[in-house]
Amino acid sequence: MSTHDPISDLITRIRNAQMRAKSKVSTPGSKMRANVLEVLKSEGYIRGYATLEHASGRSEIEIELKYFDGEPVIREIERVSKPGRRVYASVKNLPRVNNGLGISVLSTPKGIMADHEARDANVGGEVLFTVF
């Protein structure tokens, strides 16, 4: 099954799995999803992920979700830029999520990165989603 917006699909799968207190969730594999998950892992929002290759040639990513005292580490995850309405930000206008307690994940010319990394690299880009 193909999805029109793989990032929204990934976010929804994570949100739904955490509402059901699942320890792991699977999603179809792609480089974009793996790069987004790498940012979430480096920022401490998920435990990790693994890419699984099937005999049919399709790949799947298994995500290990993270909890603290039984509560999900990700309190809020929200898509900002959508296929019908793209949202771009220059380095000067990068949004701060809850006064710096959360992060914005951006797609920049230098790859997918968190907002503080984009500020350090002095690049702007498409604001994919925010996490708190």
Swiss-Prot record:
Superkingdom, natural source: Bacteria
Pfam family, one: Ribosomal_S8
Transmembrane segments: none
InterPro entries noted in UniProt: Ribosomal_uS8 (IPR000630), Ribosomal_uS8_CS (IPR047863), Ribosomal_uS8_sf (IPR035987)
Signal peptide as annotated in the record: none
Keyword Ribonucleoprotein listed: yes
GO MF term list: rRNA binding; structural constituent of ribosome
Disulfide bond entries: none
Cellular component per GO, a single term: ribosome
Any one biological process term the GO annotation gives: translation
Keywords for this protein: Ribonucleoprotein, Ribosomal protein, RNA-binding, rRNA-binding
PROSITE patterns, A to Z: RIBOSOMAL_S8
Its job: One of the primary rRNA binding proteins, it binds directly to 16S rRNA central domain where it helps coordinate assembly of the platform of the 30S subunit.
Subunit structure: Part of the 30S ribosomal subunit. Contacts proteins S5 and S12.
PANTHER family on file: 40S RIBOSOMAL PROTEIN S15A (PTHR11758)
Family from the record: Belongs to the universal ribosomal protein uS8 family.
Protein name (database record): Small ribosomal subunit protein uS8
Organism: Rhodopseudomonas palustris (strain BisA53)
